[in-house]
Amino acid sequence: MNDQLAGLTGEWALWRDCAVRSAGFPVRGLDVFGSDESAGLRAVAGDPAFREAVTWQNREALHNAVDKVAAGSPTGASTRRRREEVVANYWQRYCAKNETIGFFGPLAWGRLADSGPAVAYRAGRVDAQRSVHFEQWAIEALAQSLGLPDPIPLGPHPERDLRIRLQRSPHSDDGLAALDLLESRRSAVAEATRDKLDAALAHLDRTFVELTRQEPWRKPGEAYGARTPVYLDCLRDLQLSVGPGMRDEMAGALPALLASSRWYCDRIFDIGRTLMRDAIGERMASGPTIGRILGELMRIPAQVHAVTAQLQTKWAQLLHANEPQTLVERASQVFASGGPGWPLSVYHSPDVQIAAASALAIEGGDFLSVVGDFHPGANPLCQGMFATRHPDREQFVTAIHTEVGRPIVFLIPPRNVPRMTSRVMPAFTEPTDIHVAATPGACMPDGFPTIDVGRLLIDGEDVVEPTQGIRFPLIELLSSPLFMAAIRTWDPFPTGGHAPRITVGRTVLRRETWNVVASNAPQHPQDLPGWARALGMPRRVFAKSPLEDKPVYIDFTSPILMRTTGRMLRHAAAATPQRPVRFTEMLPTPDQCWLRDDDGDAFTSELRLVCVDLTRRAGTTS
């Protein structure tokens, strides 16, 4: 065990560093829903911090809805309701959801300690450190307008890569002047006060249009996904220490989930290896192409769904067993797996929310640790939004290479992957790693040698780059589609229509959920509260439609949220009539949010933990 790992069990350890994600507005903001909502939402629409948040995300919504609600502009009932729904949708997100964007989803870092209370912290401003960045597409648009067709590498500072290219080009004075101008507009945005931000962004947009002859937005109407030329990142002023008491509590349940994740990833690895060997075995005169094998794996193989069913069956057996062994002991037997897996499957990552009224309540044992999103066979802190803002980036990168091994084979993501931005692009490799471009436009920053996949030859189950003498296992190149298949299909617990909460000790492995076929749900807002009560749903839940990537917060006492929920159900019933909408209890509840700022306001929060499989670390034999 090194200094960067905290022990969990003999097979599992935790990174001492964890990401702390939170909402940017106090959870008490949800009190606006349920009574006299119009007055409450009018106050929200006039709040300077809320207005700034919407300005960063959607200035059209600011002008067409937020401004009108704040002013109480006279209008028909239908238009007023529609505008209030816009305000409500942003407000529920800012108060109830843990994110990593802007000051409405600030990032912080916590530390797992070997002594001290279960949780100790000091919190200040949500936006203690601000930085404004260009979106990748905006800088690429400028590059194209300057006659530089080659793509810009995905990264947190694409303007720097563009500047390097311009400085290498003859007659680049005009290009450098254009970049200087756009950067000056970005600086003005970063320095703008709340009341001047809208104008500063508008000025940047006009300059962008003048320089590129392109519109200053993309994906209009979406709430997520690199829509505007620049974005804001914030670090929260937070010093957080998680003591051994919390870790000891999680050790009674979390390793069972980790064992099942390892088993699941190994089964997916087996599927990928079989597909690879079949493709190699079918070689014709020209031999199989790596691109063809990648194409097979990019589509989630049908066999994965059978493995998911096996995973749920095994968990059902675990949860209904009456043996005297602990859950962790039973899971180690039920999910026994000897590997191997892809290199990064040494990692598994749960998001853990602590449900408690205060840090004092946690120390007194009055808490639940709630497992939320789970990332099998992956380390989400490798994404740029985390990796580039780690307080000790050198130590961060060294830890990954120590645990995974060197060199890491990295398949550069295709540029056309939905939502592939610099914030989600992995940012943990070194120039000495092996970077492979599988598609046109896939590239790395200067100093990171890149190999075109067309230069690679298959030799048995290895890949060879003959001119440089590079050789590595083909399956390592295929690990990216394998772990994406694991993440997209991970669903360990059998659900059915209603699935009760699963609690082991003080650890909640699954919140209570209700899966409702959209076509069977009420379509009218006034019918939804009674329907929910009859099913046993609490007042506050999150709902995930098969048509959406993200869940939304719902309060069944809110007329406005009932209208938006009814619309969601109608759309789902029309588009996917037999697929369920999943409702999940809100846990922690608003009175179980322990993280407070220096004003005493409580915020929703979660710890993004990284678990290390000690049996799979580089240099370890299982």
Where are these regions (language model features)?
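Type-3 copper protein
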Residues: 1-404, 588-589, 594-621
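C-terminal structured domains
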Residues: 354-621
